[in-house]
Amino acid sequence: MIELEYSDVFNKTIEKLQFSKNLIKHPYNEKSLFAILVDGKSMEPLINDRAIVVADLSNKTLKNDGIYLVYYNNKMWIKRYNIEKDTFFSINPAFSHLIYKKEEIHIVAKVLLTFTNL
């Protein structure tokens, strides 16, 4: 089992997330894993608003269609990578204007898992 803490910025609490190691299908560094609560709809329907994502700070290798946590303009964003255009973009058509060139951003981590509260 893996247990991670994350900050619920909506309720101003620290929460715990427990999940089986078997859920992660990609190589990862357990000491570099962290969880973050999503605030936004730009990656819906793949990642819902207020979902919890697990990301690996040690994994910044870009792969086509990979989902990454990136830093741009003093904010953190979750975006999909397009290797042909060398850009990061939102998958929700309502946010299609959110496109960032690789040289404009800092790659923070690769998103490995998403948990959605139903």
Language model segments and positions:
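Short aromatic/hydrophobic contact patches that present stacked aromatics
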Residues: 35-37, 54, 69
